[in-house]
Amino acid sequence: MTLTLNRQLLTSRQILVAFSGGLDSTVLLHQLVQWRTENPGVTLRAIHVHHGLSANADAWVTHCENVCQQWQVPLVVERVQLAQEGLGIEAQARQARYQAFARTLLPGEVLVTAQHLDDQCETFLLALKRGSGPAGLSAMAEVSEFAGTRLIRPLLARTRGELEQWALAHGLRWIEDESNQDDSYDRNFLRLRVVPLLQQRWPHFAEATARSATLCAEQESLLDELLADDLAHCQTSQGTLQIAPMLAMSDARRAAIIRRWLAGQNAPMPSRDALVRIWQEVALAREDASPCLRLGAFEIRRYQSQLWWIKSITGQSETIVLWQTWLQPLELPAGLGTVQLTAGGDIRPPRADEAVSVRFKAPGLLHIVGRNGGRKLKKIWQELGVPPWLRDTTPLLFYGETLIAAAGVFVTQEGVAEGENGVSFVWQKTLS
């Protein structure tokens, strides 16, 4: 049998293969191993994600290790925990998998996955069930951007039946995930109950849905081209979206712009209802309001007549973090990242008798460099254009009870270095 994967997509010499040990990924890895034989410059690695959902998960790891050892493919095993609130098990598992893939990819490597034509049909039907538009109905692309590289699906034009023929012809062994028989999961319900009926009635139903998905993708690509100038006009250098240019747009055009802006932020595709709420409840809220719409772990906010897509962060106004070894980086709470004092800068280092801490609020009138007179911190934030949601999560450096600096924003007159021995207060963020 000849290789069934689309070799024209495999332009990279470094490949990371998502390997569950099931039929699809076993055939994919086997074909890539054969392709490597024909192309000695190719480097293959595999990754297996242990979700911890099945009592057989450890046995699956052993199976994958044995297969990869036999085929001389280095294997990475990533163990993940599912704890994302508000998501079903399927969505949690998928999210954890792709986060593991992103962490494991090496520079220059592409990710290759084993989705096939039947998977594409299921994805299309799931999008149809959700009431998706052309973007959702485009289903999966053979090549897409992922984690700064590419995600390639070289089996997308092949049916599961073709993959099974390959596996049987080559004597391959694979695992069967018992959860695949549980039709309480939407995708399994389609695979086990719905698609077989449709295929029985219309044998080429999967191919037809794939063509529809391709047509939807073409329409979406055309819309991207036609709306590129509008999006560029509305979007700022900070990645925010200006509201004013969208006021005169039709509802459909405005919604398309907001969708594309969110896609650029790597946000999940919003529902039609969410798009209406973004415009009505956030963009058009009262001028004196501070509107916020939660979408999963993120928020859409309005500030200075712009829409902002931000990670939800718990305010830290009551938090005080002692920094006893200030020569070392300090980890901040709530996943805010780390801060450190580095040599060279306009902040004086602490004296031996000064306790160093990081806080997120400061009382009284403050005197900052570049401003005359004293001001309360709230007024300083307003004057410097710091968005409200950053005001109680921006690290403030204190020596004793004296505010010295706000990371990346200002230095107080009490914190100014004298001479050439200053330091910088550097904040390494982990959240957008």
Swiss-Prot record:
Q: Which cysteines share a disulfide bond? A: none
| Primary residence | cytoplasm
Q: Which GO terms describe its biological process?
A: tRNA modification
The terms under GO molecular function for this entry are: ATP binding; tRNA(Ile)-lysidine synthase activity
Write out the residues that bind ATP: 20-25
Q: What is its EC number?
A: 6.3.4.19
- Localisation per UniProt entry: Cytoplasm
The record lists the catalysed reaction(s) as: cytidine(34) in tRNA(Ile2) + L-lysine + ATP = lysidine(34) in tRNA(Ile2) + AMP + diphosphate + H(+)
Any Pfam family matching the protein:
TilS
- Write the record's keywords in alphabetical order, separated by commas: ATP-binding, Cytoplasm, Ligase, Nucleotide-binding, tRNA processing
Superkingdom to which the source organism belongs: Bacteria
Q: Which InterPro entries match?
A: Lysidine-tRNA-synth_C, Rossmann-like_a/b/a_fold, TilS/TtcA_N, tRNA_Ile_lys_synt, tRNA_Ile_lys_synt_N, tRNA_Ile_lys_synt_subst-bd
A Gene Ontology cellular-component term: cytoplasm
What is this protein's function per UniProt? Ligates lysine onto the cytidine present at position 34 of the AUA codon-specific tRNA(Ile) that contains the anticodon CAU, in an ATP-dependent manner. Cytidine is converted to lysidine, thus changing the amino acid specificity of the tRNA from methionine to isoleucine.
What does the entry note on its domains? Answer: The N-terminal region contains the highly conserved SGGXDS motif, predicted to be a P-loop motif involved in ATP binding.
Which protein family is it in? Belongs to the tRNA(Ile)-lysidine synthase family.
- Which PANTHER family does UniProt cross-reference here? TRNA(ILE)-LYSIDINE SYNTHASE-RELATED
Q: What is the name of the protein in this document?
A: tRNA(Ile)-lysidine synthase
Lineage from the top down? Bacteria, Pseudomonadati, Pseudomonadota, Gammaproteobacteria, Enterobacterales
- What is the gene called? tilS
